[in-house]
Amino acid sequence: MARIAGVDLPREKRVEVALTYIFGIGRPTSQKILSATGVDMNTRVRDLTEDEVNKLREYIDKTVKVEGDLRREISLNIKRLMEIGCFRGIRHRRGLPVRGQRSKTNARTRKGPRRTVANKKK
């Protein structure tokens, strides 16, 4: 089993698909990596030579931000938005949708389960 960027790639999958198991690499990035390293995208992971695995590993380490580094960068970006107090930062802080979705109804995923409020007696 090939291990790249701390992720074990599934042996039975094609390399193009297997690389997408790494956080931060999707299909387009996977295709760019394979064309840059000269590895055939239809090859199965189990059929990769040690040399090809090393090529992929080096290329990903040098050029693509993946796994922990990417997660850290994303969380730092969100913290920065919250610190400067911009609209997006405020929405993150309050746990509301950030990208302009309606929140009067819906938005339950972001807001969490309903907190029922007792009726006021007359």
Swiss-Prot record:
The annotated region (Disordered) lies at 95-122
Per its UniProt record, what InterPro entries does this chain match? Rbsml_uS13_C, Ribosomal_uS13, Ribosomal_uS13-like_H2TH, Ribosomal_uS13_bac-type, Ribosomal_uS13_CS
Keywords, ordered alphabetically: Ribonucleoprotein, Ribosomal protein, RNA-binding, rRNA-binding, tRNA-binding
Write down any Gene Ontology CC term. Answer: small ribosomal subunit
- One GO MF term, please? structural constituent of ribosome
Q: Give one Pfam family, short name only.
A: Ribosomal_S13
Family of this protein = Belongs to the universal ribosomal protein uS13 family.
* Gene, per the UniProt record: rpsM
- PANTHER family this protein is in? 30S RIBOSOMAL PROTEIN S13/40S RIBOSOMAL PROTEIN S18, SMALL RIBOSOMAL SUBUNIT PROTEIN US13M
| Gene3D superfamilies membership | 1.10.8.50, 30s ribosomal protein s13, domain 2 (4.10.910.10)
Q: What is this protein called?
A: Small ribosomal subunit protein uS13
**GO annotation terms (biological process):** translation
Assembly, in brief, is: Part of the 30S ribosomal subunit. Forms a loose heterodimer with protein S19. Forms two bridges to the 50S subunit in the 70S ribosome.
**What is the role of the protein in this entry?**
Located at the top of the head of the 30S subunit, it contacts several helices of the 16S rRNA. In the 70S ribosome it contacts the 23S rRNA (bridge B1a) and protein L5 of the 50S subunit (bridge B1b), connecting the 2 subunits; these bridges are implicated in subunit movement. Contacts the tRNAs in the A and P-sites.
Protein species of origin: Brevibacillus brevis (strain 47 / JCM 6285 / NBRC 100599)
